[in-house]
């Protein structure tokens, strides 16, 4: 409620480019006709995917949940219809000449979106819910975009971005292309959002050959009970197996992401984070022969606090 009151309009993220065109057309038509700001807002509200908070009356229950949602003007749709880019080739194209800042930036790399949406169903994840269904981008288009974007920016790293990079069906082909295309040019390939149960050892081993880096996995919760609550879909056996595969592939640095304050969390769940990290560290010494170890294993554990997000099963969950 408090956020909506500060916005004249809100656009559906997935199709902002398409909605901008329709919105600008409505703005120009209203200006040409000498219409008022309210006339423009009324016209904008009729564009599928645009929400104009001032044209709706929302009532709330005592617990803060929505009791009713209704338009206040004739012609304004009762519901704002979600808009989607279905064909990623026809309706979407990556920015091939992104702005390069004059100062050192944290995200100093090319970001290439390889797919949109996620095949998983983690109950805390807003993006995984609102960007359904999963839509992959054509691998040949991605190859050309990568080539052009790196040439235009001069960056030395490219991030293959998605909600779950290892679920992209053409990942191996794309990574092989990037390694061959930029061989000898010291271009690092970053694969964020890896699922430990979909760890592609052959792909990651090739990436590791380009530039040594640590691996990041996100079990999210330390206990099996809590992972089941959030629908993470990971068992301890799968986690340890995936970590073992990474260690056998030559890694000795692993980052682990967890969340605190998840719904139904107990003290035992929090202690489970330390226990799981310890078991992963022990796995390194179990699967890697002493003569093949590259020093001690490094397990870095990072935690963040759960924040309930709209449009997720946990949207009304309290924060601890």
Where are the regions a protein language model picked out?
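Short glycine-enriched, charge-decorated loop/helix-capping segments at active-site entrances
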Residues: 129-131, 229-234, 315-320
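N-terminal [4Fe-4S]-dependent radical SAM core
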Residues: 53, 59-111
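Glycine-rich beta-alpha loop elements in corrinoid/cobalamin-binding modules
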Residues: 1-70, 310-320
